[in-house]
Amino acid sequence: MSLIDPRAIIDPSATLAPDVRVGPWTLIGPHVHIGEGTEIGPHVIVRGPTWIGRHNRIFQFSTIGEDTPDLKYKGEPTRLVIGDHNVIREGVTIHRGTVQDRSETTIGDHNLIMAYVHIGHDSVMGSHCILVNNASLAGHVHVGDWAILSGYTLIHQHCQIGAHSFVGMGSGVSKDVPAFVTVLGSPAQARSMNFEGMRRRGFSPEAMNALRRAYKVVYRQGLTVEQALVELEESAKQFPEVAIFRDSVRASTRGITR
């Protein structure tokens, strides 16, 4: 028995692994690759050029690899690349890149992207991230591994959301969020470190205490960013986690969320 519903429309140039499942009334366009073990539900649209890896599950009414509405986009053949073991729930929209940036939108592995999330053009998402219902990323956003974006969060274009960070429900983020930091509000403000996430992932008490001290250096001592980075140097040599935090602060291009 075919794993592709006869009511689905598959472009002849699309390449699907033999065990890919495709539901009814789904449209898969030209220049799409779908890897083994992936399941595409009913009423899904996948446009190319798009590369979807192995063992992903995409639910109904999602639109994957659509042209960006960015007014600079003039129909160039940009790409979307999705890794392995991702779950993309109902009504998600993910746009391809633009030639003004990387020409590619990239999603890593083992991400949970819940209903009605939007991921804009040229965004880069790491692995093991969770985006809760109706979170929206504008174009050119970078999201680090293990980040969690709660429901109805809005991320401004070109923002960096650091690894292991947590963005609270309904937050409006217009500046960069350093690694491990919890932010909340609209406009978002830094509240603490994401210690609950660290505990769940097995971080040592020593590393969490070092990050607690590092947070105070950046956010509680009235230092400039440059001064705080100098203060973090010794701790960063002892704890790789502090080095990750320091590097994310240093890499900020929009200024960090305070």
Curated annotation (Swiss-Prot):
The keyword Transferase applies. Pathway: Glycolipid biosynthesis; lipid IV(A) biosynthesis; lipid IV(A) from (3R)-3-hydroxytetradecanoyl-[acyl-carrier-protein] and UDP-N-acetyl-alpha-D-glucosamine: step 1/6. PANTHER family: ACYL-[ACYL-CARRIER-PROTEIN]--UDP-N-ACETYLGLUCOSAMINE O-ACYLTRANSFERASE, ACYL-[ACYL-CARRIER-PROTEIN]--UDP-N-ACETYLGLUCOSAMINE O-ACYLTRANSFERASE, MITOCHONDRIAL-RELATED. It is found in: Cytoplasm. It comes from the Bacteria. Involved in the biosynthesis of lipid A, a phosphorylated glycolipid that anchors the lipopolysaccharide to the outer membrane of the cell. Keywords: Acyltransferase, Cytoplasm, Lipid A biosynthesis, Lipid biosynthesis, Lipid metabolism, Repeat, Transferase. One of its GO terms (cellular component) is cytoplasm. GO terms for biological process: lipid A biosynthetic process. It catalyses: a (3R)-hydroxyacyl-[ACP] + UDP-N-acetyl-alpha-D-glucosamine = a UDP-3-O-[(3R)-3-hydroxyacyl]-N-acetyl-alpha-D-glucosamine + holo-[ACP]. Its EC number is 2.3.1.129. CDD domains: LbH_UDP-GlcNAc_AT. It comes from Azotobacter vinelandii (strain DJ / ATCC BAA-1303). Homotrimer. PROSITE patterns: HEXAPEP_TRANSFERASES. This is Acyl-[acyl-carrier-protein]--UDP-N-acetylglucosamine O-acyltransferase. InterPro entries: Acetyltransf_C, Acetyltransf_C_sf, Hexapep, Hexapep_transf_CS, Lipid_A_LpxA, Trimer_LpxA-like_sf. One of its GO terms (molecular function) is acyl-[acyl-carrier-protein]-UDP-N-acetylglucosamine O-acyltransferase activity. Belongs to the transferase hexapeptide repeat family. LpxA subfamily. HAMAP family: LpxA. Coiled coil: none annotated.
